[in-house]
Amino acid sequence: MALVYLPDMRLNADLRGDVSAPPVVLIHALGTNSGLWADMPLPPNLRVLSMDLRGHGASDAPPPPYQMGAMIRDVERLMDHFNLRDAVVVGISLGGLIAQGLAIKRLDLVRGMVLSNTAAKIGTAELWNARCDEISRTGLQPYATGAMERMLGRAWRDHPKMPMLRQMLVQTALDGWIGAARAIAGTDFFTPTAALRLPTLAIAGANDGTTPPDLVRETADLIPGAEFHLMRGVGHLPMLDNPVAYGALISAFLARIGHG
């Protein structure tokens, strides 16, 4: 990965694959980074862009709060920088909100979406703002334990990916986590997402305590023709619970829409 120097910040990004291959853009969840996708297999004949969102990983972490529009604009600028058009955008949780916003704003960039473990609106402003206030006092270490259970399920302590995920979370810049969480708090895409008309696959985890299956299905139902798939035995981050099955779902969707 390498830093992309934008006028106001540096974003850590990685672009792989032939320049003529169909593009896929991967957008990670709150408190994680692009390493989240490391074990997920995708077809080799793709041009895949992944990045660390602002405030995450090796990207710059400006002071909070962040606006969702700014986070969408970051991905838009990266795609323009790399001259990517007609991409399938795969977004998980926060990344799914960004994917929806990008499709609403720049349909020329987005040919299709995979909305994974996400919704048009996640939680309430009151919940997110209270969580931000608490974390600003205590830091991310105390928050991490509850987050592990919500993301990985009740057996989180024995999950082989728990140490890696916990490290990602606690190493996220405090300004970055709070900034992005404030952006989630202020986002409601129900009306604009319902106006989208593009191939969409929505994926839910049966054990997801953050974006339960009914919430994901409700969002899929906003988009005519959207597919919905429930993954059994997985939580909020299917690429950690069952990366092979998760990658196969996404790969099959790409094949169905002729992307690759």
Per-range role (PLM):
Residues M9-A61:
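Conserved HGGG/HGGXW glycine-rich cap/lid loop of the alpha/beta-hydrolase fold
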Residues L11, G123-E126, T138-A194:
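Conserved alpha/beta-hydrolase catalytic His-Asp/Glu region
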Residues A70-A87:
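Conserved acidic catalytic loop of the alpha/beta-hydrolase fold
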Residues L97-K105, L109-A144:
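Flexible "cap/lid" loop of the alpha/beta hydrolase fold
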Residues L196, A202-A204, D208:
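Short beta-strand/loop motif that positions the catalytic acidic residue
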Residues G209-L215:
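Conserved alpha/beta-hydrolase "acid-adjacent" motif
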Residues R217-H236:
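Catalytic histidine neighborhood in serine/cysteine hydrolases
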Residues V234-G247:
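Catalytic histidine-centered segment of alpha/beta-hydrolase-like enzymes
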